[in-house]
Amino acid sequence: MEELQLQGYLEKDGSRQQNFLYPLIFQEYIYTLAHDHGLNSSIFDEPMEIVGLGYDNKSSSVLVKRLITRMYQQNSLIYSMNDFNQNRFVGHNNSFYSNFDSKMVSEGFAVIVEIPFSLRLVPSSEEIPKSQNLRSIHSIFPFLEDKLSYLNYVLDILIPYPIHLEILVQILQCWIQDVPSLHFLRLFLHEFHNWNNLITPTKSISVFSKENKRLFRILYNSYVSEYEFVFVFLRKQSYYLRSTSSRAFLERTHFYVKIEHLIDVCHNHFQKILWFFKDSFMHYVRYKGKAILASRGTYLLIKKWKCYLVNFWQYHFHFWSKPYRIHINPFSNYSFYFLGYISSVRINPSAVKNQMLENFYLVDTLTQKFDTIVPVIPLIGSLSKAKFCTILGHPISKPIWAELSDSDIIDRFGRICRNLSHYHSGSSKKQSLYRIKYILRLSCARTLARKHKSTVRNLLQRLGSGLLEEFFTEEEQVISPIFPKTTLFPLHGSHKERIWYLNIIRINDLANYLDWS
């Protein structure tokens, strides 16, 4: 019902889609949609208690109506930001700081902000229906395997957060022309933690990202989209700066002439001249806040790329990116964590015996191969954060699941185990997954024992030890989307066979915990 109301609102007039999003903030069905989205959260999310109100996180129509009434009363503040310090959006009782109000406002506003983005994506998804497999996360690894084996250096980049909140609002102006909605967003961001300083502490940004996940993802993705759009544009322009003469002096002259022409074109984006350089063997891959920039060039060239990125964030987004967030490493002796895998370029020496007439000689050859393995220690750390084990890897019970039925408990643990086996099927060393499966199996047994107020030994004697053992060691038949034939792929039978799936559209929750920790 709520989706039909929203669709009818958007179909009335095309101009209203962009210029009149603000009235949706006062519609109750928007917050119902936001609540329905929250019900589809990860199984690792814990139910939250609303501090000071005594309610759980279930949507209450009464509370939503009260929230909308308070926002109506404060409507005049949306248009007068000058008296921000004298007038408070929350009213006199500071109820806005409650978890319910802040979460519902942020989730509801995120639903509204997603409208312009979804309208742009619908036509493109209908035009290219055959590219669904490109959405798979695993499709990135065959690309890395094909390209990175021949490169020399890699930039391991942690994309910095924009410090000033006004930068995020200005970026959204390119997508949303509704001025009242932007003022409302600006007011909410500043009111959330009273961010009046130019430099916001990292801790505050971290708290905001955890308590308002959906809105934070919208803001962060819009910022990353803007950064990559400008970065890729400048990268393409620098790639076409080809020399037109064979002489070194003339090459240098023509190069700087083209540089000056490009600076005139990009003058609106930069306040200071940035030096461009040519690197035709550069590859860029990103997922969330982690990016990989690999090059076949020399150390001096990759160092220039690092300086360029630091200056890029400084002059285009007006904030300082700490240089230690960008690491330069050679592929020959470096492993980087990306998308839940520890990846590296492994050098395999081999000797070939050749014969010429009656003489034999050996030829030593070196081959480079892109390798991916399961990060056991980070996975144990993620299991520890999710309360499945201690930091040392000792299994513990999951108290919050003890109230479920036995079948639901086993199903949840089994689903986690199967998802891990499925997601890490591209590892060349799958034996390390046995330890993770052991932790989950024993944690499941202890959770069942906690529910029945018994010990693990007595529980297994009563229910039978073969129940969990048979469930967690079940072999699966896996059809590889890369190889033309169907193969049997038991987890314990093929330790070095790597299979990438084309139906995985999101990173595993345990690996996701590590990326955002």
UniProtKB/Swiss-Prot annotation:
Gene coding for it: matK
Q: Which domain of life is it from?
A: Eukaryota
The family assignment reads: Belongs to the intron maturase 2 family. MatK subfamily.
Q: Which residues form the signal peptide?
A: none
Any GO BP annotation = RNA splicing
Recite the UniProt keywords alphabetically: Chloroplast, mRNA processing, Plastid, RNA-binding, tRNA processing
GO MF terms on file? RNA binding
Which PANTHER family does its entry note? MATURASE K
Task: Relate the protein's function as given in its record.
Answer: Usually encoded in the trnK tRNA gene intron. Probably assists in splicing its own and other chloroplast group II introns.
User: Which compartments does it reside in?
Assistant: Plastid, Chloroplast
Protein name stated in the entry = Maturase K
Just give the chief location class: plastid
A Pfam family this protein belongs to? MatK_N
